[in-house]
């Protein structure tokens, strides 16, 4: 667990093959299920063919594992530093630390979506020959009879290329599309932009 903060930003997706050439998900499945059910991690599975039944196309051998307690993640990330506890949190609050905000922000959103009753899914497809097919969506949820893609942005983002590609490719299956970021509510180009704290309302 102490290595978790170090690994989270390096590999967004956890591949079982990283454990060894002959590693198979079925050999480690019970361990991942235990971590998820013990609320130590929030597992997020790749939905390879997104539809209302996200579980039907979920690839459990490729998953993201978010820490279930973001406060614990931040504490573990800096527990070996020179900061006293109060100094650390003050530095985080006032943006005086050079940290991977994207990693922590995505972890916060995963925690809020799980607390809101959603199972976590994402979409990832790599295609070096056809750039239009190369994309990654941070989270997918279902709303009524449609899927809703969610992109999480930290800092001053300027584009959402993967979300645009996803909306073109799966336009018949998508209802609302969301970007969660650190600014006010607005709608741009058919995408609903919401402050990060509103993830709990989705």
Label every model-predicted segment:
Residues 30-202:
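A cross-kingdom feature that marks ATP-driven nucleic-acid transaction machinery
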Residues 1-37:
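Conserved helicase/translocase motor-coupling segment
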